[in-house]
Amino acid sequence: SIFTFSDPSAILNLTKNKYRKGISPMQINTVWAAYFSATDTTKKVVTQIARRLSQQLQCPMQTFDFTLKHVRKTPKAFAAGDLVVFGTPVYAGRVPNLLIKYVASIQGGGALAVPVVCYGNRNYDDALSELRLTLTAGGFHPVAGATFSCQHSFSLTQGAGRPDISDLTIATGFADQVCHKVEALPSAEACPPLLVKGNDPVGPYYTPRDRHGNPINILPVKPKTKDTCTQCGRCAKECPLEAIDPADAHNIVGKCMKCNRCVRHCPRHAKYFDDPNYLYHKTELEEQYTWPRKEPELFL
């Protein structure tokens, strides 16, 4: 079922078969908040959902933050009895292309999963479908899914301040619905296939275009550094791809995913982007997709 913020069915009646003879609710040992979150928006949504699930299911919560590259160098495996709220941002309508291989390498081990994608108020396109398919192939059992519109990583105005109190309240209610569904399951294997919006197989990445319809390529774009930089090394330490030279922040020595983590974390506000195509695309996004406000979508 698909629900939006305005759906009157706030709590689903999913427990009617819970006490049927021969069936007992499955045991959840640990709720996990697992996420890649360059600018902390996905982190906020996933943590809110996981914390509430932990409270409702009365089991411990652990965090698996794989934003930084050194974390992704170690294989990760979950197990039966885990309930993993698994969040990624949406880049170009998909799970980030520089991240999807790592996500595919994570072993579900029979754990339940709640795929969550956070996007910048344009569109999540096939991202949730892609994450669901990837987690399923990795041995997870997706039990529910959600999309949340958050502040765009490029912008200070597009989706500014989101997730806000309204979003996080919806996240809490969603967790309650997930809890009811989990409590009605006799086992993870009994979880029915999760239906979400998006194509299967997934479609191409979203391509930004100028007003004449010509494609804009921002893949080679890298951040610049102002003279106010003190070489504190914060940006190099925080870069999810370790693309910034720790000895000289002016040097970008690897691929950049335009996540803007370095821009947001620099204490001197010395990191910035000045590429004309990047700025054009940023302006187009702000002009076309700041409004109307898009609300969370919940899939159960």
List each model region and its residues.
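FMN-binding flavodoxin-like domain, especially the glycine-rich phosphate-binding loop
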Residues: 14-68, 74-218, 274-300
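Acidic, Ala/Val/Gly-enriched low-complexity intrinsically disordered segments
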Residues: 7-10
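Aromatic (phenylalanine/tyrosine) cluster motif
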Residues: 3-5, 19
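Iron-sulfur cluster-binding cysteine motifs and their immediate structural context
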Residues: 224-225, 230-257, 261-279
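Short, charged low-complexity linear segments at domain edges
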Residues: 200-221, 230-246
